[in-house]
Amino acid sequence: MRYLTLEKAIEAWRKLQPLTENDQQKLSRRFTIDFNYNSNHIEGNTLTYGQTEILLLFGKVIGEANVKDVQDMTASNVTLRMMSEEALIKETPLTVNFIRTLHHTLLREDYTVYKQLRNGQQTSYVIHAGQYKTRPNSVITRYGDRFEYASPEETPALMTDLVDWYNQAEKEGKYSPVELAALFHYRYIRIHPFEDGNGRIARLLVNYILTRHDYPMIVVRSRNKSEYLEALHAADLFVGNIPSDGAHASLQEIRPFVQYFKRLVAHEVYTNVCFLTEHDENLWWYDGEKVEFRSSNYSKILMLMMTEPVLTLEHIQQELGINMSAVKKLVNQLQDKHYIERG
């Protein structure tokens, strides 16, 4: 895909408006799979793209799957729908209660985490769904440094500040929607208000902001996780280590992350444009990337699976009108590329 500026990508997107009902459904289905898979995969969820697709579209689990990962993916999709519906009610301001409700829906319930300390002793603590953290949290960076987030004591006030700032900034219109989303994301991450699920909530709220301003929702791809984290780290170097400074950072201070975020939005928006406008029977889309097959039979099999996730070889043979040996070869190649899952 050729490089486009954010402005040109948005212009191309605007030209497609209003979308037909069919295009809206196609885009929504694709985004649902891509967003949930990637946002959870970044955090260690082990479901494959194909398993995620079948789970979210058909409510079925194919192959071996971790029970908690299945539950997390399902809850993620419920939370995505909740966020999407709320974002459309533009007269309603963002509230900390809504953010905490999102978190409760995402985590579903309280649960206990068990860990082994360096001295060999066992420890445990409870993760509270929908409640701010009760213990300090931090991360070890790729450079080996410990990076502290806001303390439990200062978190409620910082979250209130963040939401109040956002609602006021939205009214004033000082920032573009993309700048507003990037700055909110960075400030939120520097607070890290919950003991788990902060990254997933941040990516949901980014799309909440974009949707409120009539921008298409975006996906932070798991395969680009290192670029995402490096952009946050580069901004941290400008802002400094004090959590409250990060929670009130300026757009100028986080410019490495803003630049990254603008490139991300441009790429994702233009990918949507291509997805809706490029029509070829040999073409398929997989996790935000265009796949061009040598034969249309590959994409025909994948299209069949969009309506029926569990197909027999005989059914495929009947639909394609080719011999069984050719069917098996096509299916094996699609499985080897992980475009379809082995049941």
Q: Where do the model's predicted regions map?
A:
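FIC/Doc superfamily catalytic core
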Residues: 1-196, 200-343
